[in-house]
Amino acid sequence: MARLRIINFYRSAYCSAMSEFRLPGEGEILGKVIEMLGDGRFKVICADGQIRVARLPGRLRRRLWLKAGDYVIVALWDFDREKGDIVHKYEKRDVEELKRRGFAEAIEALDSYA
């Protein structure tokens, strides 16, 4: 019974976080996963054309499954702009919403890079 409560707690927290539409904020950039490196690290091509190594934080490792071709938000590190953390994954329907909200050029650029 207690285990079910814990599972439902994490499921509700994950679903509520994923239901809100999120745009890249200050210090964040839109990216596309191009390669899985292992150990929670991914090679991501960002909207500015740079290829960065981004890691998936431990709090998201079991909740967020990524594969090549997924669109993500990368929070760049302050001390090393060549690396960052993946903080959000966009679903397929969210990519269409991104295009409607003015990120169509960035998505087309990411598709042309990859």
From Swiss-Prot:
Keyword Protein biosynthesis recorded: yes
UniProt superkingdom: Archaea
This protein's UniProt keywords: Initiation factor, Protein biosynthesis
GO MF entries: RNA binding; translation initiation factor activity
Gene3D superfamilies: Nucleic acid-binding proteins
Cross-referenced SUPFAM superfamilies: Nucleic acid-binding proteins
GO BP terms in the entry: translational initiation
Ranges where the S1-like domain occurs: 19-91
InterPro entries associated with the record: NA-bd_OB-fold (IPR012340), RNA-binding_domain_S1_IF1 (IPR006196), TIF_eIF-1A (IPR001253), TIF_eIF-1A_CS (IPR018104)
Family annotation (CDD domains): S1_IF1A
GO CC, any one term: cytoplasm
Protein family membership: Belongs to the eIF-1A family.
Function: Seems to be required for maximal rate of protein biosynthesis. Enhances ribosome dissociation into subunits and stabilizes the binding of the initiator Met-tRNA(I) to 40 S ribosomal subunits.
NCBIfam families on file: PRK04012.1-1 (NF003082), PRK04012.1-3 (NF003084)
Protein name: Translation initiation factor 1A
Name of the encoding gene: eIF1A
